[in-house]
Amino acid sequence: MDGNNVDPTGGCPVMHGGNTAMDKPVTKWWPNALNLDILHQHGARTNPMDPDYDHRAAVKALDFEAVKADVKALMTQDQDWWPADWGHYGGLMIRLAWHSAGTYRMQDGRGGAGSGNIRFAPLNSWPDNASLDKARRLLWPVKKKYGNALSWADLIILSGNMAYESMGLKTFGFGFGREDIWGPETDVYWGSENEWLAPSENRYGDLDDASTLENPLAAVHMGLIYVNPEGVNGQPDPARTAQHVRETFARMAMDDEETAALTCGGHTVGKAHGRGAVDNIGVEPEAAGIEAQGFGWSNPRHDGKATNAFTSGIEGAWTTHPTQWDMGYFKLLFGYEWQLTKSPAGAWQWEPIDIKEEDMPVDPTDPSKRHQPMMTDADMAMKVDPIYNEICQKFMADPEYFADVFGRAWFKLTHRDMGPKACYIGPDVPAEDLIWQDPIPAGSTEYDVAAVKARIADSGLSAADMIATAWDSARTFRGSDKRGGANGARIRLAPQKDWAGNEPERLAKVLGILEPIAAETGASVADVIVLAGNVGLEQSIKAAGYDVDVPFAQGRGDATADQTDAASFDVLEPLADGFRNWQKADYAVSAEEMMLDKAQLLGLTAAEMTVLVGGMRVLGVNHGNSKHGVFTDRAGQLTPDFFVNLTDMAYSWHPVDGENTYEIRDRATGAVKWTATSADLVFGSNSVLRAYAEVYAQDDNAEKFVRDFVAAWTKVMNADRFDLAA
């Protein structure tokens, strides 16, 4: 050692080999590489619970009434480090619950409150979520007390419910059962912007046409939940804002009445905070120093008084009595004329003209003072827009009706991504079946499975038809909001029976044979569809020389048209299916990216996606009987031929001009052996997927391939069987 290797800057002398910074991912060199990480983000390696931990069993053992009582009591337990407005944290907790649930969007089912994702980046640091870091810390004593059984996801939503209860509203109900994740969601696309609150033009085709908001987004800016409270791009215009309110709420499956109820009911309590200059507010939690311990948005003006808090920059309460559920929102909004003004922080807001002193809310900490109430541009939209105005007039005339509509809309908002009612736990689950829950009647478990299988095997249906139909029925499942799947057999109902991806003519033929079998044996059509897929699969396994049973769990039910909101299922229509090598049209997004997205929604790992694609190809179940990717001379047998031939260097691969297809040619003769799409060749091109492909191409893994395919197939068929774990 001559000292030449000494760091002259005084840096750490230890060689750091770990890539611990977020700005140094492996893919930084190849930004267009397929991001397989989205398939492995919430596995056992990130979960601190014991392998045998049963969260649903733990939840069922909770003392629900004690939990609710503790959360309700917390509302008025004022803390010096973050004082409550008027000594009541209700408004803050409602905002926490709302902003946790309000990220849900129906286009892909992502977002929402079901996983406690608001604890993690980027949501925990969105500008719209300022001060919610404090709300979560206020809840920590309750979370600490009840431990694993009370997830953050449940506690956050429960806090909103109990806030309303403590302020006089009887809520519609509550379901426990959400399970926490342990890190950021990397599969969710929140927008392409690299700047908080970047101009809305970045995500609209035409800002004057709210419907041109980029799919699947449901917020007007990066970092906001819905709309800009000051107006479109921060420019007040209630009529224009109304159109964006309508579009953003519609994208989370709310109609006009639900939207008006949530807006008015959400702003019946609490206040906005805008004392001080935004330039004086500190950075968000993810950017704050280590000594901040997860807190962000430090406020040098905050002197321990709620009056001086800063959150959105808008300042004031909406109603005269912000800690009471009443009709005060309507009284002020429609009882006064309003004029545009600015908050102390310089944000646009509206204030009433010539308001009576008794209608002014008192100061949050000094009851001897009163302040002007305020309305945001979105609130004024409820008055200016004729449709919202008419709805509000109906609410004003019937307070009980308003409370009921709001209670139901709030329940929908906070439970939309929990899935069917079988996922709910606790004494406050409403008995009523709600159509947005996609209700399914209980199915039979009394019929003879072996007898039904025999009937199916003798039906004359081909293995390919049975496998394809079962797959099409099950592939609609989305783990994001737990919608879709084979249970309910909605593939036989509108709109699914007419989807291009389901090959309507072939589907009608198959259902015409399977439905009578179901009727005659006492099985549900849903069960028979899946069982037929299993029969076809077992036939293909036997043809390949193996004897492997495909597991089956009976008990699926058949939904009716009356139990199905057909329009709400439009978003589940597959635009592409890499597993059946099909896409409806040419898209800017590649076939392999769409396949990856579908695999993530199905809850598959990269290995499961790989084995399923390879197996589906050789089974000959491509959409429209396409031959792309069928790398075998014995189609219909469940063999690893797809992988064997993909990795065989006797062949070369060549793009076909003007098409998203490729030719696989014999290197020696130049003859075309097979054709393929990018959804096929990616398994040889991507280094990670090739590693999996090589496993199944090995001589010693032919039977493993069959077993792994069956396991992955069964996982998809049972993805929506929440009743099995209830």
From Swiss-Prot:
Spell out the molecular function terms from Gene Ontology: catalase activity; heme binding; metal ion binding
Q: Name one Pfam family in it.
A: peroxidase
- What is the protein name given in its UniProt record? Catalase-peroxidase
Q: Name one GO cellular component term.
A: cytosol
Give the position of the cross-link Tryptophyl-tyrosyl-methioninium (Tyr-Met) (with W-98): Y226-M252
Q: Tell me which EC number(s) this protein carries.
A: 1.11.1.21
Post-translational modifications? Formation of the three residue Trp-Tyr-Met cross-link is important for the catalase, but not the peroxidase activity of the enzyme.
Q: Which residues bind heme b?
A: H267
Q: Which organism is it from?
A: Roseobacter denitrificans (strain ATCC 33942 / OCh 114)
Question: What does the similarity note say?
Answer: Belongs to the peroxidase family. Peroxidase/catalase subfamily.
Question: Which residue numbers mark the cross-link Tryptophyl-tyrosyl-methioninium (Trp-Tyr) (with M-252) in this sequence?
Answer: W98-Y226
Q: Which residues form the active site?
A: H99
Question: What catalytic activity is recorded?
Answer: H2O2 + AH2 = A + 2 H2O; 2 H2O2 = O2 + 2 H2O
Q: Does the keyword Transport apply?
A: no
Q: Which GO terms describe its biological process?
A: cellular response to hydrogen peroxide; hydrogen peroxide catabolic process
Could you tell me what the cofactor note in this record states? Binds 1 heme b (iron(II)-protoporphyrin IX) group per dimer.
Q: Gene behind this chain? A: katG
- Marked site (Transition state stabilizer) residue numbers: R95
**Chain's role:** Bifunctional enzyme with both catalase and broad-spectrum peroxidase activity.
Q: Which domain of life is it from?
A: Bacteria
